[in-house]
Regions:
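Acidic catalytic loop of the alpha/beta-hydrolase fold
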Residues: 106-110, 139-140
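Primarily recognizes the serine-hydrolase "nucleophile elbow" in alpha/beta-hydrolase
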Residues: 18-96, 108, 113
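C-terminal catalytic histidine-bearing segment of alpha/beta-hydrolase fold enzymes
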Residues: 128-216
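Short beta-strand/loop motif that positions the catalytic acidic residue
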Residues: 95, 100-103, 107, 134
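Short aromatic-enriched loop/helix-cap "lid" or pocket-rim segments at secondary-structure transitions
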Residues: 10-11, 92, 142-147
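Short alpha-helix in the alpha/beta-hydrolase fold that links the catalytic acid
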Residues: 110-121, 146
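Serine-hydrolase catalytic machinery in alpha/beta-hydrolase-like enzymes
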Residues: 1-37, 189-197
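Short beta-to-alpha linker loops that shape the active-site pocket of alpha/beta-hydrolase fold enzymes
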Residues: 1-5, 84, 137
Length: 216
């Protein structure tokens, strides 16, 4: 558990205690351990995640990451539930394993619109990636609870960050790497607001579960 092992309970409202990069490394190390188990077929190990974990799922397929950590790691498939797609990778080389994004039309925490551009760009580069947008659904559409509001959480609806091949995330306007918590807070000031809605949609919940069973 990438949170518990670091004594972190939540990244809501800050997004800097545990990074996507750190959890991707955790995922690769977990793959390496699982692949040595005599009862596990390394060619059938897939990855899925939600929100921040969805970002981990998505970018664990990014070849610059794969090449930097372990080129022998290859997930069978990547299923990302409402990931942050508001990154524009300088290098758009991704794994040829199937990648699929499930996201809500009304998501204002990790908005769907950047995912459309992200998927289109990768498809044009022959990536095996697809997107499902659930109509009338918010972040956490697969929860079994009504939609509520969190006034403290970051709303990324107006953000689109550049991602260099070296893995640096650049501020929207200054092109300065957000390489520490201070610079990240500074970068967020240009586009992030507070307040998001999240909660379940019964139709999207059942549909996403059925899709996951087939895809994984």
């Amino acid at each position: 558990n990438s949170f518990k092992s670091r004594e972190i309970t939540s990244t809501v409202g800050t997004q800097n205690e545990v990074t996507i990069a750190a959890i991707i490394l955790d995922a690769y190390r977990a793959f390496e351990i699982l692949s040595k188990h005599p009862r596990i077929d390394r060619d059938r190990i897939s990855i899925t995640g939600w929100s921040l974990g969805g970002g981990v799922t998505l970018f664990s397929a990014w070849l610059p990451v794969n090449n930097a950590i372990n080129q022998n790691v290859k997930f069978k498939s990547h299923l990302a539930f409402y990931p942050p797609c508001f990154f524009e990778p300088e290098n758009i080389q991704f794994s040829d394993s199937p990648i699929h994004i499930l996201i809500g039309e009304l998501d204002n925490w990790t908005p769907a619109k950047p995912c459309e551009g992200f998927v289109s760009k990768l498809k044009n580069n022959s990536a095996n990636i697809n997107l499902t947008i659930y109509e009338g659904s918010h972040h956490s559409f697969d929860k079994d609870s009504p939609v509520i509001r969190n006034e403290n959480a970051y709303n990324f609806s107006d953000c689109l960050f550049q991602l260099t091949e070296d893995g640096d995330v650049l501020m929207n306007y200054l092109n300065i790497p957000m390489s520490n918590s201070f610079l990240q807070k500074l970068g967020f000031m240009f586009c992030v607001s507070r307040g998001v809605n999240y909660g379940g949609n019964p139709v999207a919940r059942e549909s996403s579960f059925a899709f996951a069973k087939k895809f994984m």
